[in-house]
Each structure stands twice: as C-alpha cells, then as structure tokens.
Amino acid sequence: MKNNKNAVLMAMALLSLPASAQVKIDSIAPHRYAAQSIDVGANVNFSREQSTSAVSVITSESTNKRSAKNIGNSILGQGSGLISLQNSGNYAGINPTFYIRGMQSLDGNTPLFVVDGIERDIQYISAEEVESVSVLKDAAATALYGYKGANGVVLITTKRGKFNSKEIKVNLDHAINFMAHKPKFVDAQTYAKAMNEAYANDGFENPRYTQEEVDAFGSGKYPYLYPNVNWVDETFRNHSVTNMLNASFTGGGEKFKYYALLDLQYDNGFVKNPDTHEGYSTNNKYVKGNLRMNMDMILSKNTTMKVNLLGVLAESNAPGNSASLWDMVYSLPSAAFAVKGEDGKWGGNSTWAGTVNPVAQSQDAGYSRNHNRGIYTDLTIRQELPAVLKGLAVQGRIAYDHFSNIYENYSKTYVYGSPTVADWLNGEPQLGKAFTGGSESDLGASISTNSFTRRFHADASADYQNTFGAHSIYSQLKYDYEFSDEFAINSTLYRQNISWYTHYGLLDRYFLDLALVESGSNRLAPGSKWALSPTVSAAWVLSKENFMKNLNWVDFLKLRASYGIIQTDILPESGWMYYMQQYQTTGGSYPFNSGFQSDFGRTYLDAIATSCLTHEKAAKFNAGVDATLFGGLDFSFDGFYQRRSNIWVSTAGKYSSELGVDAPYEGDGIVDSWGWEASLDYNKQIGDVKFNIGANIDYYRSQIKEQDEAPKLYPNLVSTGHRVSQLFGYKAIGFFKDQADIDASKPQLLGSTPRPGDIKYEDVNGDGQIDTNDKTAIGYSTVAPEIYYNIHLGVEWKGLGVDAMFQGTGRYSGVLSTKSMYKPLVGNTTISQYYYDNRWTPETAGTAKFPALSSTSNANNYNTNTLWMFDRSFFKLRNIEVYYNFPKAMLAKTKLLNAAKLYVRGVDLFSFDHLDESDPEVFGATNPLNRSIVAGLSVTF
C-alpha cells in the first residue's frame, strides 16, 4: 500500500516548481512530510511546503500492485483528480481512458501525457520502469505546457541509476485470467419458444417453429438438424495465461550512473482452438518487449548530461478477415446451425451465413497481425554558470520519437453448409436439399502501414536560483519547439512556447509563483496563432506561524490558491479546414445546342469559412489545504471552478437552412465546471505491526452555458444548461397492460402502433401526446462519472503483509445497446437469458423489466429512454496482494540476494454494481473484462 510519505497525500503536494524547471530547492522545515523532496522529472525536486499548485503523486510502491500490461493500467483508481476507466478486455487493446477533473469542454477532454518531460504515448511504458506519476490539475501546475495543458497533465518520471552502486532486480509474474462476465444466452429450445412468442406478439398467423421442432431442439436427438450450440464455450476457452518477466540493472560509478530495463510480456488469448493449421496461429495473443536505458553523466564540475532511450517491439495476433468474434457470439442463436456438419463442413445456412460462424472464423479464416515498432530518445545537457552569476544555469534538450504500425492480413475462405428439413413424417424429420455456401481458398496476403508518428522536440532554458536572507527566488526563461507528423493528410503540427516562470519565498512560509506563457500553433488561423497564458499562485504555511506553535497535534498546515487563464488550440475534428471556404466538385448537365452535355464538372460552395479568430481558453481557480495532523494523519482538500470559453461550435443552430451551405464554426461555446477533491492517509507502526489506511474522493460537475443551440419548441429539448455528455431520451413509466390501457393512454406517435407489453412514456411537455418533442435530459453523463473514489489499506507483520485497494464511481449512467439485450430476436439474432427471464408477458406484467418479445424493429420500444438506461456506478476490488518479504538476515547467508519478495495478487476480483448481465465499465458485444490471479516473485541481487 501507499507509504504515508509517498501516497495519496502526495496528491496534496502542490508543485511550486513546474515539471520543466531544472533546480533543486531544499526546505529547512522540521517536519519530514512537509520537507520531503519529490522528483517530478527532468531533475526537478521540490518541497511540499513550498508548493503552490494542485498536484497529486502516485509512487512506484503503488503502481506495482496490479501486474498490469502498462503504467496506464497500473494506476487505475489512483491519483486524486484522475479518473481512469477500463475500456477493453482484449489484452492487446487494454488501454484505459483518462480524464482529469471530469468533463470540461465540448471539443475534447483528454489530458496530456508526458514521459520524462516529453509528450509521449504511455501504452508501452511498463510499471516497473516508472518512479512516479504526477497528476497536474490547476492552472499553476499546467501553465508551462502551453496550449496542450488545458485538460490537465499526467507526468510520468522513469527510474534512474545510482552513483557508486550496482543492483540487479528480476520480477516474474504468472497470471491466469478469467472473463469477469461471460455472457449467457438462451438455449436452442428456449430460443425457438421465444421466436414463437415474438411471432404471436407481432400478429403472425403461424409460429416460426412447429411444436415438433421445438421438442427436437430440446431433445438433442438431431444435433445437425436441430442443434443446441453454446457459441461462447465453443469459441473461447475458460481462461488465458499472461507471463511477464523483467530484469532491471541499476548502478554507476563516481561520474556515471545508469538504469536499464528489459521487459517481456506474453498473453496467449482466449480463442479455444487456435492452432488447427500448421505454420500459424489464429489466437488473439500479444507479445511485447521493452528495452530502456537511462544514463546520467557528470562531464565536468558544472556540466551534466542525461540520455534516455526506449525501444519497443509489440505484436498482436487475431483471427483473419478482421473477424469480430464477440459481435458474432452476441448475434448468433444457439439454434442457428451446428459448429460443423456430419460431412465436416463448417456450419452455415441461408438464414445465418457461415461467415458469421464464430468458431469457423476463429479457426479457418486465416489470421491477422499488427506490428508496433517504436523508438523514443532524448538528450539533455545542463551547464551551471557560477563564474557568471551564482545560481545561474542554462540547459538544452532535444528529443526524437518514431512509432509505426504495420498490419498484415492473411485471410482465407472456407466451405460451409447445413442439411435442411423438407417436412416431418411420422414424428421424424425428412431431409431436404442440403445447403452449401462459400468456397475453400488458400491464404491471401495483404500488408499495409496503418500509421506512423514522428515527433521532434527541442527546448532551451536559463534559470536562476538563490537565497538572500529571508528571501528565496527561482526564475526560469524557456523556449520550447515541437514538430509532429502522422500518417494522414494535413497532420503536421508545429507548436512553440516562450515562457517565464518565477517562484518567490519569504521566511520559508510565504510563497508566490508567477508564470507567463506565450504559445503558438499552426492549427490556428493566421493572425491568431499566438496567445498568452498568465497564472498566479500562492501558499501560506500556517504551521510555522507563532500562533500555531502551541498546537502540538498540528505537524504541518498550509493554505494555497491559484488562478490562471490557459489558452488552447483545441479545434473540432479537421478543424483547420474551417478557416477556408470549402468547395465540392461534381458532375453536371447543362443545355448546349439541342441537348444536354454532362462531360464536365461543376464546383460549388459547400461550407462557409469561419470568421472566428479566437482561442478556446480555460479560466481556472483552485483553493486548497494540506495538513499533517497527530503525527501521521495526512490530509488534503481542493476546491476548483473553471470556465471554458470561446469553444468552437457549429453555428447551424443560429442560421436558417435557407443558407444553403454548411454553417461555419465559431468560438461561441461556454462550459462551466466545478468540484472538489479530498484525500486522507494514515500510517502507524506498533511494535512489529505496520498498517496504513487511506481514501480519496472526488466530485465533478459541468454545465453547458452556451453552444449556439438551435431554438427548440419546448424547454425540455434544450441541452444548454445541462452537463456535458448529457443523455436525452424519453421517460419510461411502465408497460401497457392491455389494449384498454393503450386506448385510455395518451397516443404515442413514435413510429409504430403500441401494443400490450410495449413501453409507456411520460408526456413531458404536456401537449397530450408522446412524440419526439417529449425527449428530455435523463440520467448522468455516459462518458465519465461525477463521483470517483478509492479506499486503500494494508497491514504487515515481520515481512508478511496484505494490501488492498477498492475503487468506485457514482452519478454515472449507461445505456444498454447490446444486440441480445437491445432488439433481441430482431433480424434473427439471439436473446440473452437475462432478457428472456425478465420480459413482459401477461403473467409477468407486474415484475417485468423489458418489453414483450418482438421479431421486428419496434420503433416504440427501441429508442433512447430510461428503461434502457442503467446506473453505471460501481464499487470494485481493484487489487489485493498477499506477500512475504524474506528477512534480510536470511538473505545475507546466501551472499547473493539482497531482497526477495513472494506474492499472490488478485486483480478486479469482484464488483458491486447495478448491471446483472455485464460489467458497467465494459458492456456490449466486446471482450468482457478479465479477473486475474497472479503468482509472482521479485528478487534483488
């Protein structure tokens, strides 16, 4: 668990120095927590008591508890102010979604990720190579990142070597993964009954299946004519295995130190029989290797150099033809066809083609492979200039990153078919003409470059740090240049920053920070590419005042506040185009002589160029308190308010359609957001027993103040005034009981005639009928929760310990859209057992959760409404670890080992939530999330 000096209340540590500063400031505070220096990257160390901005820190002790694929998955649920959510159960695609302080804008809310001072993708950064993760939240903390910092910054600092030492550390993890929520669908006989019930509800004269056929599905007597296939179990095995091995080498001499890491990962996926073909596998497996080298060199008394290198090779394998196996599983009923026929052909028929046979697709459609290659490099030289002026230094850094993705697809087709039944005679099915489709082919090959990214960064700075009696000062002048290019049209991006930052301290208790950043970007229009971002922040260490001396229970107490305006270059997708008139060229016919000629094109105006030359900007205010009380209780609280203005929005709502072309975008959007964050952490040791307990809770809220919304007939239709990502739909008030109930109710004009068992809606606008004008705001955001919290605790006795972290969300909504739950049976799709058990029938009218069955797309039922909406909040055990640290005295006898730890971990073992059928983080026709049991060993030589 988190150490009391390194854990959640690092979240309270507020950076008085930004991450790009290059100086160490020492504190003379008597209290260890307040005086502790924390490395936030690029050789920046700062004192907690000197900090004036809102930053939370996650240390390496916390990031190594999950045995996760990358650092992003390692910090799930951690870091005050950081929302992290899982979005996939497929190992190759496990990369969480992050937000800092919730939803803040209409055009983009993704934070900036920085690794060792350079913007970088974190999906290939392993937890073992990370020293700390800092979450920069307020204007003072993010100012020096210019246009890129408005949504907050996640700053990752990797490990470095140690002078005059040598250490080798090896970690081995073996994980067994299970699907957290394996979907359950009805069996073949139940499916046949459900289809017959749906046909009756739809008014069809004859059932879909005769009673003989329904009985045949249940008897199992005719497995090729009337099959009963569990497609989940036939396609996927019950578990997968992940192995992770890394070895790090830390050390150095008097003037050189190094940190090197080799990290290897392998996950073998869930496909059940992937090796039926010689020479290749169709499994959805994943292999990755990282090689990192961080070096520090003292070139002279006043000159130092740092070099960071990271190479990444990653490869993911999947079934061919871009087969979406889970989409097939969620669509195909168990009664469709057998996996294979008696003749050995793959199953398939005229109703359900063999190309949707998930077993055939997983084994006999070939395979695809993604190759990811990346190299990340940076070099920094720092020169102290005491001969010029004591405390003066200059620094330069260059960085170059290159990443590419190459996609190989080796696909093939296969023959599929099924026997048919012509009729039943004397209680036995009579065979008809067999159905055959598809064809057998060899592997075809195609190779393409899906993407590549190049990024170049250079910066140069001069900084000055000194103390004059009761006064201390640090000041920095810095220039940043960045170029990036991607595998796409008009993707080249240039950014520049010119920044000035000053930190002032008085009597080691009053602190003031000022920053001015002038940023430029080629994303913006000529004449408006540059903008100024000013910030100011201050802190007051009350615990050093004389009037606090007698309060022995107060070890450390500090108040702080910040305000700033952060400019951005955030634009809508392809936003650069909006600065120019948009034209289209099409064919045309015009009268010439005696006929019409069409062998020439015509060009017309398609969209008007914007006249908007403003920047989206974030005005941020933050106030907070940090404290250490009773010799071990660390506490932090932050409250914030932000206004985003000049957000680019479409002006289509302001102009009549008579304009005849697409309306321009203008910077008229305004969004307000506010909230608070609180952290507690308590550590204690009694004899040989150490224990700690802590918690974070964050609350966020947003409101759209302006977005150029088109006038609406009724106020319930207006989204302005509601939260960002607010859902709009109908309010369900039950089901129609019978025809008399329908006749007595207000007419529902939603595209289909209501019938018993259909959803009944509220007349929101009071006009006596239910139509599209009755939509209204329902639920909360479906993108990010408004409440996010965690609880962590741990206890250790003589090396034997237990750590656990729980994480939860609140005020969070979702909408069921999975085929087997939403529109089941429509288009011959399957139906989940949960829907079937909770469907409306005359007998279950009082307890039903879902509408009556239908084989047609019922427009009355299948729309966004509160019946399909669910409470997405959850409370999960993110990770638990039982470990044993071997006594050093025992290890000393080996004359080889310096440390050894044996552990067993559980990852995402259980969830308390409101969704019985799936997981609230990831639901729908996709890979379920995994639960993992991990056995591991860590040894240090």
Stretch-by-stretch model annotation:
Residues 2-4, 8-17, 21-38, 42-112, ...:
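Membrane-proximal, glycine/serine-rich, low-complexity loop/turn segments characteristic
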Residues 294-303, 308-313, 322, 329, ...:
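Extracellular/periplasmic, surface-exposed regions of secreted and cell-surface proteins
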